[in-house]
Amino acid sequence: MREHKTISIADQIFEQLERDILTGKYQRGEVLSEMRLSAELGVSRTPIREALRRLEQENILSDSGRGAVVVGISREDMLDMYEMRIQLEGLAAQRAAACISDQQLQQMRETLDLQRFYIEKPGSDHADQIKDLDSRFHQLLYESSGSKAFYETLSSLHKKMTKFRKASVSRHSRAVESLAEHEAIYEALSRHDGEAARQFTLCHNINARDSMARVEE
């Protein structure tokens, strides 16, 4: 599903800025000038200009005339995107149940085992690892659907929710619940039970939406 290719400097800058905006490093309403970003990132203004243009096309930035203004993702945006995910991801899971491979199931199993390891690991905060493994599970689900359209659409929605997802899984009780929901989805996929996979995924996303709705923006 994913291709390995050389990433240009403009692509690297785009991905870095997108990640920084979606994780909250740059706040909504903050102005990002080419000069400032050139100094911060240590690159010329040409790839920055290209990256900013692409971020404006993604509606993550807007042009104010004095620089690019961070639009980011609001709580309302997040809830709207979850309404889309609730329906689409259930359908993707239903499709995945019919065509998921043993290798993809094994990758899911390994991801869930690691997720459990970090949730149960005592000591310092492991929210970043748990969030990344949560993303990995969902990416595998999208890939397993066998549909490029589902994969690209759902991957984009999932990525744009980064800040809210991290805040949600930082709550240990929600991280535990989410893992149990992932396990139920995995078991349905293992049985190639499309309707069960759809229903478990639907419930998982409704619970995740309700949890995120309680997160302070």
Question: Which residues are covered by each model-predicted region?
Answer:
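Active-site loop of classical SDR/Rossmann-like NAD(P)-dependent oxidoreductases
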Residues: 173-175
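Short linear motifs at protein or domain termini
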Residues: 1-98, 214-217
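A short secondary-structure junction motif
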Residues: 20, 24, 63, 115-118, ...
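C-terminal effector-binding regulatory domain of bacterial HTH transcription factors
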Residues: 1-4, 195-217
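Alpha-helix N-cap/N′ positions at the starts of helices
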Residues: 65, 88, 110, 177-180
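Conserved amphipathic alpha-helical segments that form helical-bundle/coiled-coil interaction surfaces
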Residues: 102-167, 180-188, 196-207
